[in-house]
A protein has these predicted regions:
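Mixed-charge (Asp/Glu-Lys/Arg
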Residues: 1-38, 43-106
C-alpha cells in the first residue's frame, strides 16, 4: 500500500494541525500516542500542564478504514474514566475523536 498513512503519521498530522491552526486555544500541546498514552493521542493544553488543575482537551486519533463504532468509543471512554479516577490526569474539558470516516450508529 504505497502512500498509505499509518497511525503514527495520523497522530503527527493532527498534532501539527493543532500547532498551526489552534495555537491561540492551546499554548501547549503534546503528542502522546502509542503504548502507554493512557488514552491520549494528542493533547491541547489550555493552561500550564505542570500546574495542578490544568485545563486540557483530548484528541483521540483513529485511522480506521471504516466508521468508528460504539465498541471503539466505549473502549476509549473506559480508558478516560479509569485514568481520571486513578488520578493520572484531570478530566478533559473536551474530548474529540479525529477519524476520516465519521461515527457509525452501531
Amino acid at each position: 500500500m504505497s502512500g498509505a498513512v499509518h497511525d503514527e503519521q495520523w497522530e503527527v498530522f493532527v498534532h501539527d494541525w493543532l500547532i498551526v491552526c489552534k495555537s491561540d486555544d492551546y499554548p501547549w500541546s503534546e503528542r502522546l500516542g502509542g503504548a502507554g498514552d493512557k488514552g491520549r493521542d494528542v493533547v491541547g493544553y489550555k493552561s500550564d500542564p505542570n500546574v495542578e488543575g490544568y485545563s486540557w482537551d483530548n484528541y483521540q486519533c483513529k485511522l480506521y478504514k471504516k466508521s468508528l463504532g460504539f465498541s471503539d468509543v466505549v473502549v476509549e471512554f473506559g480508558k478516560l474514566i479509569y485514568f481520571t479516577l486513578n488520578g493520572d490526569y484531570p478530566i478533559p474539558q473536551k474530548y474529540f475523536f479525529v477519524a476520516p470516516y465519521d461515527l457509525s450508529t452501531t
